[in-house]
From Swiss-Prot:
CDD domains hit by this protein: ADK (cd01428)
Gene name of the record: adk
Keyword ATP-binding: yes
Family: Belongs to the adenylate kinase family.
Secreted listed as a keyword: no
Protein name (Swiss-Prot/TrEMBL): Adenylate kinase
Source organism of this protein record: Wolinella succinogenes (strain ATCC 29543 / DSM 1740 / CCUG 13145 / JCM 31913 / LMG 7466 / NCTC 11488 / FDC 602W)
Described purpose of this protein according to its UniProt entry: Catalyzes the reversible transfer of the terminal phosphate group between ATP and AMP. Plays an important role in cellular energy homeostasis and in adenine nucleotide metabolism.
HAMAP family documented for this protein: Adenylate_kinase_Adk (MF_00235)
Residues involved in ATP binding: G12, S13, G14, K15, T16, T17, R131, R173
Pfam families, sorted: ADK
One term under GO cellular component: cytoplasm
Pathway membership, UniProt: Purine metabolism; AMP biosynthesis via salvage pathway; AMP from ADP: step 1/1
Length: 190
């Protein structure tokens, strides 16, 4: 049985870095993937699904939700280790519902927890912009990414809270402190 942990958080929350470090600290037991990496790996594999994905990405189009979710679930099932961390998913209620639907049919994958790395908008902005004050376009891009993240956040939180699997972590600390807490939490759930 594969245990899946989804790690969500604002741009600049450190979710990818946290997950990478935890996987590196536990090479025998934990895999980490990002959705983009999984799609690129599927294309590189030359599989039928990879060819379909490339048909969309090569034209700059979004990959249909169903294909994204199938790719994620396939990667989880084929992961060499039993614990899988995926960061940056779900990004929408549609992605959340699609994954939930597929996981209901899967007996060998369990969504163990969704970990939300919480940071204020100001901290996230400072991290993303590297404290380089001024460049409005960068701040503008950040604000857009932030609003895209925040728009579906409440229903996503409510959905996973109702399932009793949402776990929030304060992301406004050192990487060491955050990783230590997150890693300890993940291990406590195995």
């Amino acid at each position: 049985m594969k245990k899946l942990f989804l790690i969500i958080g604002a741009p600049g929350s450190g979710k990818t870095t946290d997950a990478e470090i935890i996987a590196k600290n536990n090479p025998d037991s934990i895999n980490h993937y990002s959705t983009g990496e999984l799609l690129r790996a599927e294309v590189a594999s030359g599989s039928e699904r990879g060819k379909i994905i490339e048909g969309f990405t090569s034209k700059g189009n979004l990959v249909p939700l169903e294909i994204v979710v199938e790719t994620i679930v396939s990667a989880i099932k084929n992961a060499p280790k039993n614990v899988v961390l995926i960061d940056g998913y779900p990004r929408s209620t549609e992605q959340m519902e699609a994954l939930d639907k597929i996981l209901k049919e899967e007996s060998d994958v369990e969504l163990t927890n969704v970990i939300e790395v919480e940071v204020s908008e100001q901290v996230a902005c400072d991290r993303v912009l590297g404290r380089a004050r001024g460049a409005d376009d960068n701040a503008e891009v950040f604000r857009n990414r932030m609003s895209v993240y925040l728009a579906p956040l409440k229903p996503i939180q409510a959905f996973y809270t109702a399932k009793g699997i949402l776990h929030k972590i304060n992301g406004e600390r050192t990487i060491e402190e955050i990783v230590s807490e997150m890693e300890g939490f993940i291990k406590s759930r195995l």
